Amino acid sequence: MGMRMMFTVFLLVVLATTVVSFMSGRASHGRNAAASDLIALTIKGCCSVPPCIANHPELCV
């Protein structure tokens, strides 16, 4: 392989890695949002229970 061919292959590998990394990062945003919603619902549940409010008042501000 010549230098140009090796450089071209290198650029293609970098591009493919970047695209895969970008797409997998995007896919995880939905999972993170779902986890955040679950945490928010749990905290709201805690705020409706007096003993939980007493133990964790910072959550119910």
Swiss-Prot record:
GO cellular component terms attached to this protein's record: extracellular region; host cell postsynaptic membrane
Subcellular location: Secreted
A Pfam family of this chain: Toxin_8
InterPro entries associated with the record: Conotoxin_a-typ
Keyword Signal: yes
Main location group: secreted
Signal peptide location: 1-21
Record keywords, A-Z: Acetylcholine receptor inhibiting toxin, Disulfide bond, Neurotoxin, Postsynaptic neurotoxin, Secreted, Signal, Toxin
Residues of the propeptide: 22-44
GO molecular-function terms, A-Z: acetylcholine receptor inhibitor activity; toxin activity
Entry comment describing in which tissues the protein is expressed: Expressed by the venom duct.
Keyword Signal assigned: yes
Modification after translation (UniProt): Is not hydroxylated.
Biological function: Alpha-conotoxins act on postsynaptic membranes, they bind to the nicotinic acetylcholine receptors (nAChR) and thus inhibit them.
Domain remark from Swiss-Prot or TrEMBL: The cysteine framework is I (CC-C-C). Alpha4/7 pattern.
UniProt similarity note: Belongs to the conotoxin A superfamily.
Protein name listed in UniProt: Alpha-conotoxine-like Am1.4
Taxon lineage: Eukaryota, Metazoa, Spiralia, Lophotrochozoa, Mollusca
